Swiss-Prot record:
Structure-specific nuclease with 5'-flap endonuclease and 5'-3' exonuclease activities involved in DNA replication and repair. During DNA replication, cleaves the 5'-overhanging flap structure that is generated by displacement synthesis when DNA polymerase encounters the 5'-end of a downstream Okazaki fragment. It enters the flap from the 5'-end and then tracks to cleave the flap base, leaving a nick for ligation. Also involved in the long patch base excision repair (LP-BER) pathway, by cleaving within the apurinic/apyrimidinic (AP) site-terminated flap. This is Flap endonuclease 1. It comes from Theileria parva. Interacts with PCNA. Three molecules of FEN1 bind to one PCNA trimer with each molecule binding to one PCNA monomer. PCNA stimulates the nuclease activity without altering cleavage specificity. Phosphorylated. Phosphorylation upon DNA damage induces relocalization to the nuclear plasma. Belongs to the XPG/RAD2 endonuclease family. FEN1 subfamily.
Length: 494
């Protein structure tokens, strides 16, 4: 649910804190995605399109969330976006009342839905269908399995996914939180993205926490008080208090206890809610936990086709697209790396997007330090040894169906066009520096081959005339284009 009425209030009071984005504009960014919220959106989208039915496999298990997850992850990778899916665990005790209330609301909605279906009232069905959906444990587990087979990072929250997402942003492991729940902001997430899991026709909304604080003229502690008074999942609300009244009360009293006592509420409940927002229980992760892994084509085929009855032809096309997007990304990244020197002596572009403030700039209590924090160190046991960043991972972890080490090695000429282009640009940059070199030295350029040893993450330069391995590449005598590429690749993998 999040904070009641927060977005409409901010749209009116601090419109500059909310902006619209396209999915393409997030290229190169990493998103901490609230998995439960995303799976809910995927399921709703399928059920909305058919009024009340879901996609199911031969066992009668819902697969709507799998279908939605496949499509959205495909888009993320196509645009060079790194998704990190964060899954809820056991909810905190403070949320018990809220969860019970939601259960009762679902039961009532189910009864109304059955009646609307029997009467053929399609409009009522469409309104009610979303209220009956619940993301089950089985749906979460199947989603995790799919993501891992795709090489997409999976993070397990200690309790609330929103708090864990905010932690990842606070620790600079991800740039944005993608969720429909606005309490992510109250947990300290610097940037909240909404509608990320919705259809591509919907604009993504970005909420900037620092701009919210500046516009409301609140410090972070006052913002928490304001949001709790608006209504959250962890305590009851005060009668007659919405966002506008809450804003006025915080401005006047600037103290949550005084406000609650003035309105005749139980401050202990509000105090516990505030303490949880300031010090939620989260698992500790490092950068290895959010790195993209390898795609498992065989595992994906078995899971999607055999276990969940997806079309084999469509699954093959899906896997082909995933591999294509990863290859495209590495080519772009490698080319940028090799041609970077030509920009060294130029002024920086005035259009470059400035780095936005971190959550730490506005949150007084940070995860992992200070009194009352609840950080539990989590080993990244789900991450394989060869799972590394997108750019490096495609260099050293290309999927292979063979156990033979020889088959795991790839030659540069597989990307011949890329290296020719890079070589020409590099030689143009260096031509003045090396124009005095002899023709004999230049001829060596045609007799060198670069090989990758994927298992050991090494780059090898070979003299084709006598198959001898060249152990060094002299950076001061680099008239050979392939020697230059070798030199940069050595720098890349160190």
């Amino acid at each position: 649910m999040g904070i009641k009425g927060l977005i409409p209030f901010l749209s009116e009071k601090v419109p500059s804190s909310i902006s619209e984005l396209s999915l393409e504009s997030l290229s190169g960014e990493s998103l901490a995605i609230d998995a439960s919220a995303a799976l809910y959106q995927f399921t709703i989208a399928i059920r909305d399109s058919s009024y009340f039915s879901s996609l199911v496999n031969s066992k009668g298990e819902s697969t709507s969330h799998i279908y939605g997850l496949m499509n959205r992850c495909s888009k993320f990778l196509e645009y060079g976006i790194k998704p990190v899916f964060v899954f809820d665990s056991k909810p905190p005790e403070l949320k018990t009342k809220t969860l019970e209330k939601r259960r009762q609301q679902r039961e009532e909605a189910n009864a109304s839905l059955k009646k609307a279906i029997s009467e053929g009232d399609k409009e009522s069905v469409k309104k009610l269908v979303g209220r009956t959906v619940k993301v089950s444990k089985e749906m979460n587990e199947s989603a995790k399995k799919l993501l891992r087979l795709m090489g997409v990072p999976v993070i397990e929250a200690l309790e609330e996914a929103e708090a864990q997402c905010a932690y990842l942003v606070t620790k600079n492991l991800c740039r944005f939180v993608a969720s429909e729940d606005t309490d992510t902001l109250v947990f300290g997430g610097a940037f909240l993205l909404r509608n990320v899991a919705s259809s591509s026709s919907k604009k993504i909304l970005k909420v900037d926490l620092q701009k919210v604080l500046d516009g409301l003229e609140f410090n972070f502690d006052q913002f928490i008080d304001f949001c709790i008074l608006c209504g959250c999942d962890y305590c009851d609300t005060l009668e007659g208090v919405g966002p506008k009244t809450a804003y006025s009360l915080v401005k006047k009293y600037q103290n949550l206890e005084e406000i609650v006592n003035f309105k005749g509420g139980d401050y202990d409940d509000f105090k516990e809610a505030k303490e949880y927002f300031l010090s939620p229980k989260v698992n500790e992760y490092d950068e290895n936990s959010v790195k993209l892994g390898t795609i498992d084509p065989e595992g994906l085929t078995e899971f999607l086709v055999q276990e969940n009855n997806f079309s084999k032809e469509r699954v093959e096309k899906f896997i082909e697209k995933l591999l294509k997007f990863k290859t495209k990304k590495i080519q772009t990244s490698l080319l940028s790396f090799l041609t970077a020197p030509q920009h060294n002596n130029k002024a920086k572009s005035s259009n470059k997007r400035p780095r936005e403030p971190k959550a730490l700039d506005c949150k007084p209590n940070t995860y992992g330090s200070g009194k009352g924090t609840n950080v539990v160190k989590k080993e990244s046991s789900t991450i394989k040894k060869d799972e590394i960043d997108l750019t490096a991972e495609d260099l050293f972890c290309e999927p292979s169906n063979s156990d033979n080490e020889e088959d795991d090695r790839g030659r540069v000429d597989k990307n011949e066009d890329l290296f020719k282009k890079s070589e020409n640009e590099t030689n143009e940059i260096k031509q003045n520096q090396f124009k005095s070199k002899s023709d004999e030295k230049k001829k060596q350029e045609e007799h060198h081959t670069i090989e990758f040893n994927f298992n050991h993450r090494k780059v090898i330069l070979i003299d084709d005339d006598d198959d001898e391995v060249v152990t060094t590449a002299n950076s001061e005598k680099m008239n050979c284009g392939k020697c230059l590429i070798y030199y940069f690749l050595q720098k890349l993998i160190k």
